[in-house]
C-alpha cells in the first residue's frame, strides 16, 4: 500500500525528472553575409508550420467558429517566446526546450539549419552561422508581353516554390507554381487542356488559389507564363449553362466606368459559409448581391464571366498595356 508520504516523494521525483528534461539553450545566431541579424528566427520543433498544416490548411463549411479559434491561437503562437526566439543586436538568443526537441534556425535568403537539443547541449558554446543561398546575376525581360490568355479554369494545384535568388535584387513577393485545367477560353485561345504558370504574391498564398473555379488572366513574357498579379474572379457554374461571379463586379476595380450588367443569376444550390468564406477566403457579402440567414449566405446577383472580362479590359489590363482605346 502506497502511503501519503511515499506518494509525495514519488510525485516530487517525477517533477524533478520532468524539470531535468527542460534545458535553456543560449548562443549566437549569425548570417555569414552581413554584420547584423535582421530576419533570424529560432523556432521550437517548427511549431508554426505544423500548427498551420494541422488546423488552418483547409477549413470545412460549418466549422467557422473552430477555424476562428485556431486562427487566434496561431496568432498567439507566432508571438509566443516559448516557441519562437529572435536574436538581439549582438546576435544572442535564448530559448527553453526539452531534450527530445529540435530547434529550427532560419533567416531570409539563407539556408535553414535544424539541430537536436540533445546535440546542442554537448557544445561548450553555441554559434550557428547561416550560409547565404547561392545567387545568380539578374536577367531582366525587356520585351512586352507576347500574349495574354483569359480563361475559366479549375484548380489542380498551387504550391509554394523557392524563387531564384538574384545577387543584386531583393524580392518582396513569394513565388508559387500553379497548375489549372482549362474549362473555357475567353481570350487568347490557349492551346491545351491544362496550363502551368508562375504567380507572385506579396501577401502570401495567392487569393485565387482559395477557389475551385476562377477566371484567370495569364500573360507570356520572354517565353514564360505568369499570372497577371492579383487579377482574378472566383466564378461558379450557373443553371443556364454559363459561368458567373456573385457580388459587386467592381469590388476589385472601383474606378471602372463601363456599363456592366448586374443581374439576378441562377446559381442553383450554391451557398457560402459566412465565417469560413468571409475570413479564410476573404469574401465580402453585401446586399443586394447576397441573402444572409445566420451563417448561410445565398448568392443572388452578380455578373457573367464575359462582363467581368470587360471590366478588366477597361481598367487594370488597359493600364498594363494590353488594350488600346479602340479595343
What name fits each language-model region?
Residues 94-102:
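Short Pro-Gly-centered beta-turn/loop motif in secreted/extracellular proteins
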Residues 102-116:
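A short, solvent-exposed loop/turn motif at the edges and junctions
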Residues 50-90, 189:
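Short, acidic Ser/Thr/Gly-rich low-complexity loop/linker segments typical of extracellular
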Residues 27, 83, 87-95, 128:
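Glycine-centered loop-to-beta-strand initiation motif
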Residues 213-327:
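Netrin-like (NTR/C345C) domain of secreted extracellular proteins
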Residues 23-31, 66-69:
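A short, amphipathic beta-strand motif
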Residues 134-232, 316-320, 324-326:
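Basic, polyanion-binding surface patches
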Residues 119-138:
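Extracellular beta-sheet/turn segments enriched in Thr/Pro/Gly and aliphatic residues
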Amino acid at each position: 500500500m502506497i502511503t501519503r508520504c511515499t506518494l509525495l516523494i514519488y510525485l516530487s521525483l517525477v517533477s524533478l525528472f520532468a524539470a531535468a528534461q527542460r534545458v535553456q539553450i543560449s548562443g549566437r545566431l549569425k548570417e555569414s553575409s552581413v554584420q547584423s541579424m535582421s530576419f533570424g528566427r529560432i523556432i521550437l520543433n517548427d511549431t508554426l508550420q505544423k500548427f498551420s498544416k494541422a488546423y488552418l490548411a483547409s477549413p470545412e463549411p460549418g466549422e467557422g467558429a473552430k477555424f476562428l479559434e485556431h486562427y487566434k491561437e496561431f496568432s498567439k503562437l507566432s508571438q509566443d517566446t516559448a516557441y519562437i526566439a529572435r536574436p538581439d543586436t549582438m546576435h544572442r538568443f535564448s530559448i527553453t526546450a526539452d531534450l527530445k526537441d529540435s530547434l529550427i534556425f532560419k533567416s531570409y535568403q539563407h539556408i535553414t539549419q535544424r539541430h537536436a537539443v540533445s546535440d546542442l547541449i554537448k557544445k561548450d558554446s553555441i554559434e550557428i552561422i547561416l550560409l547565404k543561398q547561392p545567387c545568380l546575376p539578374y536577367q531582366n525581360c525587356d520585351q512586352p508581353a507576347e500574349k495574354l490568355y483569359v480563361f475559366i479554369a479549375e484548380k489542380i494545384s498551387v504550391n509554394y516554390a523557392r524563387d531564384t535568388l538574384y545577387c543584386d535584387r531583393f524580392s518582396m513577393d513569394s513565388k508559387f507554381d500553379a497548375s489549372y485545367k482549362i474549362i473555357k477560353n475567353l481570350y487568347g485561345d490557349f492551346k491545351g487542356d491544362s496550363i502551368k504558370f508562375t504567380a507572385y504574391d506579396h501577401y502570401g498564398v495567392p487569393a485565387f488559389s482559395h477557389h475551385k473555379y476562377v477566371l484567370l488572366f495569364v500573360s507570356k513574357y520572354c517565353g514564360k507564363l505568369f499570372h497577371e498579379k492579383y487579377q482574378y474572379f472566383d466564378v461558379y457554374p450557373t443553371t443556364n449553362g454559363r459561368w458567373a461571379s456573385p457580388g459587386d463586379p467592381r469590388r476589385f476595380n472601383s474606378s471602372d466606368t463601363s456599363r456592366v450588367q448586374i443581374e439576378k443569376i441562377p446559381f442553383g444550390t450554391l451557398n457560402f459559409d459566412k465565417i469560413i468564406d468571409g475570413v479564410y477566403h476573404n469574401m465580402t457579402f453585401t446586399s443586394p448581391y447576397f441573402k444572409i440567414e445566420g451563417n448561410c449566405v445565398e448568392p443572388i446577383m452578380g455578373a457573367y464571366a464575359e462582363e467581368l472580362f470587360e471590366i478588366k479590359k477597361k481598367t487594370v489590363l488597359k493600364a498594363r498595356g494590353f488594350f488600346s482605346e479602340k479595343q
